[in-house]
Amino acid sequence: MSLPDLPGFERLRFDTELKSFNGLLSLFLSSPERVKASGKKVVAKSPLSPVDPIYASGALAYDPYTYETVVNVVINEDYDLTGEALDAGVNSDFNPWNMIMLGSVFSGKNKVPIDIYSTACGCGDDQIKKCWQIMAEVKGSPLQFWEIPRFESETEKWALDFLKKELQQLFKYLASQTGKEITDDALADAVRRGNLLRQDMLDLTRLLQSSAIPISALEFYIAQLIISDYAQDPEALHDSYRQLIEELEERVKQGVVAPGITSDKPTRIYLMGDETQEFQLFNIIEQYGGALVGCDSRLSLYYEPVKESASVLDALARWIWNMPHNMPTAERVKATIPYIKQQKPDAIIISNVVGSRNLPGAERLVRDIIGEELNLPVLSVETSLPLEDIEKVDYQIRAFIEMNAY
């Protein structure tokens, strides 16, 4: 696999023998050119905001939170964008993903042009709301929020009725912006295409259950990140995923381990919590004798496909409401436990990102639940922008893996 000559790539160790990953990465990096050539409206959405309605409207979904950060900071190492975010009016305690996204748009350095800002919001999404408001105002673009109620089993009927009404309002809004009505058939087709990708990720994750782990941590993590907006082309992304899965399945059949894994008997690591900008973390896990066997940062998007046999609106509403990301912390972790068990980990690493309000405040609760349910050692690491905390993270992961090596 050949990589572009960019500063961030020089710091990372990739699996150059995994030919299919080159196509997947190229698809991701070519988003700006493909979007401009499509002539379609671009709808910005946050990472965990469902995209099926956007594609049903004939528009393209775009996750600037992920793309702008990976391209501008992880790859091109443009750290000045945090200053642009501060100039835009946010506090320095915002998480770095939001800071880079906002700085990119505010400065005009965003790679993909955005026509519409529309995203789902749940509890604790005040940073997203603030950033979206500033970006839409700066660009003079239309802005719309829709709400996902917090998961509580005793409020199921009310929550689903509320969510269906929110989705119907979303459909009307997108239709007013794109000129295309979202019909049941269009929504069903978008869900079908989304389900192909969700199944791809389930299949990819299952391959990590093998004793001969066929994909390195960094490649697996990047493959997960790309699903957040379907790379503006669900069909092309599905093709890229299938090529990757087929190549990895062949490795499993032949007992070939990903070349980045350095130990003959690696400590199997499951990563949960916030997605990190510190991509070197994944190389570090393998450098000291570990191997990544699962990562739940985006798994709330594809634990289960959307049911296609029921009313598409009812099925989509129920799927959204049941996403682990929308659950209170204790319920979320408990919902994740069965999927962690399937991956047969030896240890857990919790990823916390500075400025995030995801897991840090409930870290003790998370540790207690994991200890009770899985009886596995747990390490918590905290990262911010790339390279800021790398020495501390390197030391923590090295010591953790050495203590838990078999």
Give the positions of each predicted feature.
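An N-terminal, globular interaction/scaffold subdomain
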Residues: 43-110, 132
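Internal, well-ordered alpha/beta segment that forms a basic, Gly-enriched binding/recognition surface
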Residues: 107-207
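Glycine/threonine-rich flexible loop motifs
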Residues: 124-130, 356-364
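A short, acidic, amphipathic alpha-helical segment used as a generic capping/interface helix at domain edges
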Residues: 103-108, 327-343, 361-365
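Proline-aspartate-enriched helix->loop->beta-strand connector
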Residues: 113-114, 344-350
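Peripheral docking tails and interdomain loops at the edges
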Residues: 3-5, 364-406
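Redox- and metal-dependent alpha/beta enzyme cores, enriched for Fe-S-associated oxidoreductases
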Residues: 55-83, 270-341
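A charged, amphipathic alpha-helical module
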Residues: 2-41, 164, 168, 172-299, ...
